Regions:
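Conserved small/polar residues in nucleotide/adenosyl-binding loops
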Residues: 148-154
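Mid-chain, well-packed structural core segment of small domains
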Residues: 77-103
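Short, hinge-like loop/turn segments at secondary-structure boundaries
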Residues: 45-51, 92-94, 136
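RNA substrate-binding interface of SAM-dependent RNA methyltransferases
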Residues: 1-79, 142
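Flexible, gly/pro- and Lys/Arg-enriched active-site loops
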Residues: 98-137, 141
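Short amphipathic alpha-helical segments
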Residues: 17-18, 42, 87-90, 108-111
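Acidic, Ala/Val/Gly-enriched low-complexity intrinsically disordered segments
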Residues: 156-158
């Protein structure tokens, strides 16, 4: 399973998502441009030493990403999605695409992507924090495969 972040704005969110990716053995794709440098102190403070434990793939733009992964199923997480995330049939190699914190993804991407899902929310609110959204959706997406690609460290009591 892959997490794809479209032009992320907030270094702390991206760092938290990379930590999640490291812990759950997920690849993280960053669609450039990011609004910050990966050497940013705010990013480094949150990512700690997890950055080296996670495959991070950077793409100069969405067109380059799409050209490389055009045969993959891309699932857009959006407040405009019609299907609720826990009713969606995730697959092992899905590319879970999350928009930028400030603006989501452009309308053009909404038009070309078929699979659009959402997290139900209070109608008085606009959106969840992107790192929280990633954690919620990824936990559900991995459930059908029973997290079989992970093992508990021997030092953790069961």
């Amino acid at each position: 399973m892959h997490i794809v972040l479209y032009k992320p704005d907030i270094p702390q969110n991206t760092a938290a998502i990379i930590r999640l990716g490291a812990c759950l053995n997920l690849s993280i794709h960053l669609i450039e441009p990011c609004s910050f440098n990966l050497n940013d102190s705010r990013f480094k403070r949150v990512v700690m030493d997890y950055e080296g434990m996670c495959e991070i793939i950077r793409h100069n733009n969405f067109e380059i990403f799409l050209k490389k992964y055009h045969k993959s199923r891309i699932v857009l997480m959006t407040t405009k999605g019609k299907k609720i995330y826990h009713r969606f049939k995730f697959r092992k190699n899905d590319m879970l695409l999350f928009g930028r914190e400030s603006a989501g993804v452009p309308k053009e991407l909404h038009k070309i992507l078929k699979n659009k899902i959402k997290i139900p929310m209070n109608k008085k609110t606009r959106s969840l924090n992107v790192a929280m959204s990633v954690a919620i959706v990824v936990s559900e997406a991995l459930r059908p495969v029973s997290y079989t690609h992970l093992t508990l460290p021997t030092s953790v009591p069961v």
